[in-house]
């Protein structure tokens, strides 16, 4: 997908860089694969704020995306490539040979009319999903499971990809987009190729209003708050706020937040890059 920069006819247009949407082939989603959901506005069931800077925004319809790809051996044809307001990637509508319809994350280079497969017998081609043990070493992959049958949990956002680097016994070694290198069971599934909409990172909103359309409210700095609201608040005049801290009082720069005795740490060969 390409991006376009608009002429600076207004202040909001001057810095705006948005996608061209040229790959989108349908504007109305498949009715059987969507449902409505009321926006929480960052409040919980008691009406209390649990997440700041969320509220407003355009109404969204949730698309049901298939992250399990468990219809093994049944071919599917790509019918449309669609926009999904709930994620950075595009989604593709699949028509299976037995009549079922499902949405998947659209990988880079996927075309309408292509035939996709999943399962151990599937070929390692773009959009096909198969166990890691059946994928050649060095292949670029996305939508990776952490547990067999759980559904894809890793590498799902626009433009991202991981690489299968080697095999060690019943595990495969995967290099993730963060730079982390970790072992994952060979029976876990992954999809061939990288996630589409790779130019998403180049987009710029151009104005505050576009952020509000997306449900993002202004984010205040802690140093301009009062002491009751933030550890860095208060002081006479413009003060530095002291050592950078989070709203809960934890050091904000360099403090490790991962649990030291986390069970999955033994599968991590190389920690992610900062």
UniProtKB/Swiss-Prot annotation:
List GO terms (cellular component aspect). Answer: large ribosomal subunit
Keywords linked to the UniProt accession? Ribonucleoprotein, Ribosomal protein, RNA-binding, rRNA-binding
Q: InterPro entries attached here?
A: NA-bd_OB-fold, Rib_uL2_dom2, Ribosomal_uL2, Ribosomal_uL2_bac/org-type, Ribosomal_uL2_C, Ribosomal_uL2_CS, Ribosomal_uL2_dom3, Ribosomal_uL2_RNA-bd_dom
Biased amino acid composition, Basic residues: 207-220, 244-264
Q: What GO biological process terms does the UniProt entry carry, in alphabetical order?
A: cytoplasmic translation
> Which residue ranges does the record annotate as region Disordered?
195-274
Instruction: Give any GO molecular function from the UniProt entry.
Output: RNA binding
A Pfam match is Ribosomal_L2_C
* SUPFAM superfamilies in alphabetical order: Nucleic acid-binding proteins, Translation proteins SH3-like domain
How it assembles, according to the record, is: Part of the 50S ribosomal subunit. Forms a bridge to the 30S subunit in the 70S ribosome.
UniProt-listed PANTHER family: LARGE RIBOSOMAL SUBUNIT PROTEIN UL2M (PTHR13691:SF5), RIBOSOMAL PROTEIN L2 (PTHR13691)
Spell out the family assignment given in the record's similarity comment: Belongs to the universal ribosomal protein uL2 family.
Instruction: Relate the protein's function as given in its record.
Output: One of the primary rRNA binding proteins. Required for association of the 30S and 50S subunits to form the 70S ribosome, for tRNA binding and peptide bond formation. It has been suggested to have peptidyltransferase activity; this is somewhat controversial. Makes several contacts with the 16S rRNA in the 70S ribosome.
- List the protein's name: Large ribosomal subunit protein uL2
